[in-house]
């Protein structure tokens, strides 16, 4: 266990000025970060089920990549008993456990030096549809993770969650208008201004804008639940053939965008379709385990935004969520076809979905760099 409480004074330049860029997720990684789940108003049984699931995710990742986990001081003793011994526990306050969205985006240069981008965070919408209050501890998470690694920090003047962007490492950024252009994120900025900031801080030059994310995704349609890059020139899209499903028009519109765009290198995209699980719904028993608080209520019968696209690529291993016995094997087979050189590892992940996300949402990779 390590303790981090270090102020990393932000740099006054921007990554693109300094020759830094965000690498693709398939680039070599030195670590993956996660955060301990404990909110009783988001996780049933005060997080007990989620904690057991997170431990399985740690094991699945840990076979390929070292895992760090931020844990508030009050929960360190329990974390030591629940989590595998190979995880590095780091004392760290947080309001919840979404490392993808509160953690830093680590950028690298040609020499392999790593630095981090610390984005603004307002709990997916602030006082206009945000998911909980306060979020002041989450605002400090990225800084603490960067301090753990000794990385210099850029402070970006933009509210942005890591789950709202995907990059191919070759100049292309994919995102959704539903999230990035939402009035509850950066209402004072135009689309062009947001693109300008992403160019500055990710060092990208081409944007693929999908309109919407997954139906009922409470993050306002994060791209990491809807579509991701498999490699340069290839994407994986969340899909259903059921034209009566509310997801169908969203996925169909996304497919049309993807079919009619090119990436930063001028390539037409190869598009893989990953089937939708379910549909899946929150049960009465599952909703009863969540207490009332400042978090979004968990209601019985509510549709869950389940998606197999919400997987992590880490050092030639794909860690993906098992969500529905009817489609889990189909998803695994499809992922193996897309990633023939990777090991495909499924983890039962319904408990993460009940909290509003999945495996990609609760992880944040640190590129290998040097």
Curated annotation (Swiss-Prot):
Keywords of this protein's UniProt record, alphabetized? Answer: Hydrolase
Q: Which domain of life is it from?
A: Bacteria
- Identify the EC number(s): 3.5.3.12
Q: Which GO terms describe its molecular function?
A: agmatine deiminase activity; protein-arginine deiminase activity
Kindly state a single biological-process term from the GO annotations of this entry: putrescine biosynthetic process
Family matches, as InterPro entries? Agmatine_deiminase (IPR017754), Peptidyl-Arg-deiminase_porph (IPR007466)
Q: Which reaction does it catalyse?
A: agmatine + H2O = N-carbamoylputrescine + NH4(+)
Show the coiled coil region(s): none
Task: Identify the enzyme class.
Answer: hydrolase
To which protein family does this belong? Belongs to the agmatine deiminase family.
This chain's protein is named Putative agmatine deiminase
Question: Can you name the source organism?
Answer: Shewanella oneidensis (strain ATCC 700550 / JCM 31522 / CIP 106686 / LMG 19005 / NCIMB 14063 / MR-1)
What is the primary gene name for this protein? aguA
